[in-house]
Amino acid sequence: MIQHFHRMISAALGISEKQIVQTLGLLNDGATIPFISRYRKEVTGGLDEVQIESIKTHYEKLNEIAKRKETILNTIQEQGKLTTELQKRIEETWDNTLLEDIYLPYKPKRKTRAEAARQKGLEPLATLLMLQREPHPEERAANYVKGDVKNVEDALKGARDIIAEHVSEDERARNSVRNAFARQGTLTAKVVKGKEEEATKYRDYFDCSESLKRCSSHRLLAIRRAEAEGLLKVSISPDDEECVERLERQFVRSNNPCGQQVAEAVQDSYKRLLKPSIETEFATQSKERADEEAIKVFAENLRQLLLASPLGQKRVMGICLLYTSDAADDLI
């Protein structure tokens, strides 16, 4: 496992495996990044602080994914649903988003509408609708009218809830919506009604709409701050109509009454389950990227301040205590 980590980090950063191993060894021994960069160049092969930090970050992320995979495998194993093929796929996946998509159908859920419908015995009806061969689904649904299922429409609604959850957990469907968000996601912000005066400093964002991928980090962070303060309502949305059409092309294979039931379930799935889930994903990712970019800008600005002459034209002598008992003096 550790050697696999070394290979992946090496491929991602373009740094040799030997340098990765040596650097991680120093970090595991408790050495700090500045110390390694300054005093252990002969061990790391001359890596600078940025490269060492990247190695550390990649290693920590891989460790987190490995722990998550262990939890996922144990959970699915306890359900008795872990096949050899599924286990192999999980073990070979190192993309966190894909890993969570694979796990989603097996993830323990609170009592959803679909789960309530299953408990009413409506899953066979949902399967029948998905096949889209039955010309009279209402007649078949009548067989399920008993107990908590009050009428035919109640049975069909429960079956649609099951189909909607199935659509929302389908990897291809999720990637389709995810790609739409990535290509055409629009960030929209509107001031909360009645908070106009309190939100004066955010007036530039009272009614704004722009492409998420083109939104600058400082604007995105300002909008998210205002949202956290309860002053703006913020949303991210792709072309809803196009997304639904793509999903219908994937799941709806007939114009008969069963196909119409599936189409209705697909529309519900997108609006109620898929879109909110992917929107949350993109909100988190875009905020993280904006934070990283802001940190880089602040770090560079601070670097310029620290490099500025503190005393103008006056002479300055600096003393650097070396790792050995020696010291180096510089007169500027």
Model regions and ranges:
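N-terminal cofactor/phosphate-binding cores enriched in small/glycine residues
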Residues: 18-20, 24-39, 43-44
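Short, small/acidic-rich helices and loops at N termini and domain boundaries
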Residues: 44-46, 54
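Generic start-of-chain signal for non-secretory N-termini
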Residues: 1-21, 28
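Short hydrophobic beta-strand that contains or immediately precedes a catalytic carboxylate
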Residues: 318-319
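Single conserved hydrophobic/aromatic residue that forms the stacking wall/gate
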Residues: 323-332
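Duplex nucleic acid-engaging cores and interfaces of nucleic-acid transaction enzymes
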Residues: 51-54, 61, 65-310, 315, ...
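Generic structural marker for isolated residues within well-ordered, non-membrane alpha-helices
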Residues: 6, 33, 113
